[in-house]
């Protein structure tokens, strides 16, 4: 009998973390590597937020808090939801975790039973299916194709719902594609959900503030107030506030769900880092002017990435509405051989050879459930982007 849990056979390590670690190892070994795999901003955490953390430390605000977060941050989150999303929550309806990933995991662990299904549009963030499996559920994948700009249609959602469906995971703007649903597109989905009152909505809004070209962000419970009682609206400070390592995610939802999630968290990590919570209060309540300034940089990089990738033989790339990713297709590269004689049979081989032959690290599309593609994070310097796309262009140009 194996010492390790049989549950581990159902899941795999995070491919995005694996790519980032591989790139870091090659750099440490002296290799010339440009990493386009990491899903985090290259900006520093704003100074006022760091000062708030320092102030908390100097004043001894470093003790335990309630298992799912301190009241001061819960109140700040309530203010954020009201200000940005027209959603009214009480502090008892707020859960704070060690990153958005823990919030999603807690919700699934608190609600899933054997046989329960969770609808996940593809391409998806790599952790969604594995978290469902760990919670004992069944991921049901619904392809949001490139022909529909990587967005799920109302008809697809309708056709995927069964009497076993418990959750629909919604992510806009999306990781890995950056696709954002307009109000009209989201309204069509909410109309379907209103016809199926047994289906709950898990809305991952982590990239809410990272949008471009006057795109108007919206979230399901905002669009359809009648969904409020069966929606968990998830967010965090990692992306918009350049606080990935501070590990603060949060959610608003029905009190009975939040209470169940608190029970899970009280028996796992207990409270998120207290100092990080005080920093998050300042992030949400403090000046927000740096966000549009950062977005100007992200938009410039997005436009650069889309142009240079579309100028590359065998690659085509859509222009996303948000986040800091592009998800180009490599359909025109499949079946060709590299200068090293390796046949590009799929996007995993493409990404592997790209790293080995050019030193550019990207994440292969199969990790996100839709191929043949790869994900590029353009949250890095213009210099690195230009050099990386130069190498990608050369690599693809030499395919035969």
Describe each region flagged by the PLM.
Residues 2-4, 12-14, 19-22, 26-33, ...:
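PLP-dependent class I/II
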Residues 64-97:
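Conserved N-terminal alpha-helix of the aminotransferase class I/II PLP-enzyme fold
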């Amino acid at each position: 009998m194996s010492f390790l849990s049989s549950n581990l056979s159902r899941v795999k390590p995070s491919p995005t973390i694996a790519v980032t670690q591989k790139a870091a190892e090659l750099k440490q070994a002296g290799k010339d590597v440009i990493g386009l795999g990491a899903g985090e901003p290259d900006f520093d955490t704003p100074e006022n937020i760091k000062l708030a953390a320092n102030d908390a430390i100097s004043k001894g605000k470093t003790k335990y808090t309630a298992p799912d977060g301190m009241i001061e941050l819960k109140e700040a989150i309530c203010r954020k939801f009201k200000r940005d999303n027209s959603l009214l929550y009480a502090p008892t309806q707020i859960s704070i975790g060690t990153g958005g990933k823990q919030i999603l995991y807690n919700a699934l662990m608190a609600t899933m039973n054997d046989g329960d299904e969770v609808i996940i549009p593809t391409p998806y963030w790599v952790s969604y299916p594995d978290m469902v499996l760990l919670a004992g559920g069944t991921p049901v994948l619904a392809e949001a194709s490139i022909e529909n700009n990587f967005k799920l249609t109302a008809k697809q959602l309708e056709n995927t719902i069964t009497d076993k469906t418990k959750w629909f995971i919604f992510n806009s703007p999306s990781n890995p594609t950056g696709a954002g649903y307009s109000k009209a597109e989201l309204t069509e989905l909410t109309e379907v959900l209103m016809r199926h009152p047994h289906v709950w909505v898990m809305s991952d809004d982590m990239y809410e503030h990272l949008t471009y070209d006057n795109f108007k962000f919206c979230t399901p419970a905002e669009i359809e107030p009648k969904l409020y009682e069966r929606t968990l609206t998830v967010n965090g400070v990692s992306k918009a506030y350049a606080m990935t390592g501070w590990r603060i995610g949060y959610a608003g939802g029905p009190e009975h769900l939040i209470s169940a999630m608190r029970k899970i968290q009280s028996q796992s990590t207990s409270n998120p880092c207290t100092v990080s919570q005080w920093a998050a209060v300042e992030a949400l309540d403090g000046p927000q002017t740096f966000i549009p300034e950062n977005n100007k940089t992200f938009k410039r990089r997005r436009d650069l990435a889309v142009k240079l990738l579309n100028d590359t033989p065998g690659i085509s790339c859509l222009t996303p509405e948000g986040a800091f990713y592009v998800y180009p297709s490599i359909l025109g590269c499949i079946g060709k051989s590299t200068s090293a004689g390796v046949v590009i049979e799929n996007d995993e081989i493409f990404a592997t050879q790209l790293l080995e032959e050019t030193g550019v690290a990207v994440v292969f599309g199969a990790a996100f459930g839709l191929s043949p593609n790869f994900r590029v994070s353009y949250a890095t310097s213009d210099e690195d982007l230009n050099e990386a796309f130069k190498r990608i262009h050369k690599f693809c140009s030499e395919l035969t």
